[in-house]
């Protein structure tokens, strides 16, 4: 388990033992203001690596795992201001893991391409709304390509971006909602074979569902 200590700019690694209670193994420094940690295999060695977003330095720290509970020195990638939630997938069909990050200070989602060795290179930004936070990816319109959905915490709404398989996304439309979406997830919630969305509202402490139609459109349940 990895835990971000924002005030100390550290990541703490906890190792589980036979008691089932994780114990602190060690910690290491990261860029200022670590916020959200993702576990993803970026260099395709079948070992989970870490990606740490830092609000204070506007960076992503890519920390490759050795496979024995230790990690290599971080590779730091500069992104837009205030990186929040990320999504991962193969945006351009080259077999490597790519990333996208909601950058709140830029009112956009930033797309990065991976090279299969643990590096991420910024490719493009797409305008979302004010203070984007939540981000999720799946094939919303059933064309075989991954798409993006981004929730805006300040302006409300969910921006839908359809991918074309080359690493490029086109903004299709925005779902109108008054909810200040802080996180966003997807899944086939009604088992009809079509992806739906779930939005967490920060102010109302509620979970709102949107039903997908398989064409990239979503409607409140």
What spans do the regions from the language model cover?
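A short loop-to-beta-strand structural motif that recurs across blades of beta-propeller domains
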Residues: 10-13, 59-62, 108-111, 157-160, ...
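Hydrophobic beta-strand segments that make up the repeating blades of beta-propeller
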Residues: 1-4, 50-53, 99-102, 148-152, ...
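Acidic Asp/Glu-based divalent-cation binding sites
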Residues: 9, 49, 58, 94, ...
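Blade-edge motifs of beta-propeller repeat domains
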Residues: 15-32, 64-81, 99, 113-130, ...
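Beta-propeller blade termini
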Residues: 35-42, 84-91, 113, 133-142, ...
